[in-house]
């Protein structure tokens, strides 16, 4: 899959170095695979939450950080919408409309 934009992840792990390994692992899995549907993602990322409108929330470093992406399964593009601390995630008003 094509991921837009890796730089968002890099900026985050520069501020939060303990997130780097897990964000890189997440990136590599999506970069090297084709996911046709949410079930395929759930097989690899069992704790992923599907919040509607093709948006998925991933726990990073246990539950310390959150990553929200939007996936276009037809074009195989993943858009990074949010990466932040759990506290920042909790302050989001409406995940479905990110």
How would you name each of these model-derived features?
Residues 1-64, 72-77, 86-98:
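Basic, Lys/Arg-enriched alpha-helical interface segments
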């Amino acid at each position: 899959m094509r991921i837009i934009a890796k730089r968002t992840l890099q900026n985050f792990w520069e501020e939060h170095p303990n997130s780097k390994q897990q964000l890189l692992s997440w990136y590599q899995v999506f970069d090297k695979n084709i996911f046709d549907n949410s079930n395929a993602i759930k097989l690899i990322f069992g704790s992923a939450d599907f919040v509607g409108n093709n948006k998925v929330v991933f726990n990073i470093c246990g539950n310390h950080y959150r990553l929200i992406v939007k996936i276009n399964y037809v074009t195989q593009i993943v858009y990074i919408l949010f990466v932040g601390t759990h506290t920042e995630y909790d302050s989001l008003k409406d995940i479905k409309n990110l």
